A protein has these predicted regions:
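Glycine/proline-centered helix-kink
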Residues: 22, 108, 129, 134-146, ...
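Hydrophobic alpha-helical interface/terminus motif in multipass membrane transporters
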Residues: 25-28, 113-114, 148, 176, ...
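Alpha-helical transmembrane segments
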Residues: 5-8, 74, 132, 194-203, ...
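Hydrophobic transmembrane-helix bundles of small-molecule transporters
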Residues: 150-259
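Helix-loop-helix hairpins in multi-pass membrane proteins, especially solute transporters
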Residues: 57-189
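Small-residue hotspots
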Residues: 79, 84, 95, 102, ...
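12-transmembrane solute porter fold
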Residues: 1-17, 21-23, 33-44, 50-57, ...
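Membrane-interface helix caps and helix-loop-helix hairpins in membrane proteins
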Residues: 89, 183-184, 209-214, 309-311, ...
Length: 454
């Protein structure tokens, strides 16, 4: 039981961190002047999570599970402390990057710990419980963030999570035996080159909102997109990959499915980044209420996924779910500026429900139609594509918001303008995601490609 609590606690750190931070970001910006960096705060955390997740297994193999968890928890706690102490937005972003890196290590190592600490007969139940931790975080973290924001002590939220990170380190040292999880180091190196190029791509896209002219912003965005293409090319040729080799080819099932995940995640992340600020400014929502509205998407995702679990046909749920996501995005563009608030809540929950309807069926179809040697990559690449999409989308949302003047401070007029364009601008990307879903569910989707070619 104590070891079960340990892996749940490690998962909780990242699960609760994201929504807590989203809830308090308006308070952070008012205090240290970070309105221009909203998107970067999310993107930095996600980039750290990608690198941490990609190297967690190797960390365990090289040093053993207990030292690896100590390093992960320590880096996470250090990041929380840096965010709590930050005198400026630059230090805050560094803290968020360290939180993402440490949190990515901790979550990845907790999944490694399941196979090391529990008999195989218990794996399914433990993994189900870890999924439940994410649901619990949806209910609790808006309350945590809201209470600290309303008390005017947002830094206290990060001190709270720093303390939890340190407690996790102590518990891991007491509960995990020395040498657990260690093995002979693997020959291949972690995907550092791909993560570096991906980081540069996200920075270039996010920087588009910081240039003084539209021409410079366009060049920055184009460079970012070109670097994304280079990332896919490098990853396909690397021995240590983040994605299947076919990820860049939408004619394949894996390529179409991962494109769908990337586009829809990138298209919808803007509400997670700016939703709290927009709701507080335009609709006078208290931080706690704004946080729970943000969490409504995750709650609806879970409820919809449970409602359709084991049912079919999968084609219907994939197409319906992805279509609902696009319609919800249009609904947010129309209702965020002027309300009413109950309709906004409906749109937020519809967006989450769309993901819940489509996700498990999409995952099953991607894995089932991927060649056997690539199936491990296909399984692990779906959350990776989700993180990459969220990081790119957060950077793009930040660029759009800054081009609309959001970086100079949040006024009602600026919030109303941003409230429309932050969602309307991503509707075409959501449409691409829906078209990719149609390719994923094409009647001829069998084997490795949708066209039947090798």
């Amino acid at each position: 039981m104590p070891k079960f609590a340990l892996v749940c606690a490690g998962t909780w750190l990242t699960a609760a961190d994201e929504l807590t931070t989203a809830t308090i970001m308006p308070s952070v910006a008012r205090d240290i002047g970070g309105y221009a960096w909203f998107g970067w705060a999310v993107a930095a955390f996600l980039l750290g999570s990608i690198l941490g997740g990609a190297t967690a297994g190797r960390l365990s193999v090289r040093f053993g599970l207990r030292p690896a968890l100590t390093v992960g928890g320590g880096v996470y706690a250090l990041g929380c402390a840096a965010s709590a102490l930050s005198p400026s937005i630059g230090w805050f972003l560094l803290g968020r990057l360290l939180q993402g890196l440490g949190g990515g290590w901790v979550v990845g190592l907790c999944y490694v710990a399941v196979s090391s600490l529990f008999p195989q007969s218990m794996w399914a139940r433990v993994f189900s419980a870890l999924a439940g931790v994410w649901g619990a975080a949806t209910l609790v973290s808006p309350l945590i963030g809201g209470l600290f924001a309303e008390a005017g002590v947002w830094r206290g939220a990060f001190w709270l999570f720093a303390a939890q990170g340190l407690a996790f380190i102590v518990a891991g040292a007491l509960l995990i035996r020395p040498g657990a999880g260690a093995a002979e180091p693997q020959g291949e190196r972690p995907p550092y080159a791909q993560v570096l190029v991906l980081t540069l791509a996200v920075v270039a896209i996010g920087a588009a909102g910081l240039w003084p002219t539209g021409g410079e912003a366009a060049v920055s965005a184009i460079v970012g997109l070109a670097l994304l293409g280079l990332f896919l090319r490098l990853d396909a040729r690397a021995s240590a990959r983040l994605l299947p080799r076919s990820a860049g080819d939408p004619r394949t099932v894996a390529g179409a499915g991962l494109l769908m995940i990337f586009c829809l995640q990138a298209a919808t992340i803007a509400f997670s980044v700016y939703g709290s600020a927009l709701l507080q400014t335009l609709h006078h929502a208290r931080p706690i209420l704004a946080g729970y509205i943000l969490g409504g998407s995750a709650f609806a995702w879970t409820a919809a996924a449970l409602g359709v679990a084991g049912r079919g046909p999968d084609v219907l749920f994939i197409r319906l779910g992805t279509g609902v996501i696009g319609l919800a995005l249009i609904g947010l563009a129309l209702t965020i500026p002027h309300g009413p608030l109950p309709v906004i809540v409906v749109c937020v929950m519809a967006q989450g429900a769309g993901f819940g309807l489509a996700w498990s069926f999409s995952a099953a179809r991607i894995v089932a139609n991927t060649p056997e040697p690539e199936r491990a990559f296909a399984s692990s690449s779906m959350p990776t594509a989700q993180l990459i999409g969220a990081a790119v989308g957060a950077a793009a949302a930040g660029a759009i918001a800054n081009l609309l003047g959001f970086g100079h401070g949040v006024t009602t007029a600026r919030a109303s303008l941003a409230g429309f364009w932050l969602f309307a601008s991503f509707v075409p990307l959501a449409a691409v995601g829906w078209l990719a879903a149609l390719r994923l569910t094409a009647s001829g989707a069998s084997g490795a490609t949708l066209t039947g070619s090798a």
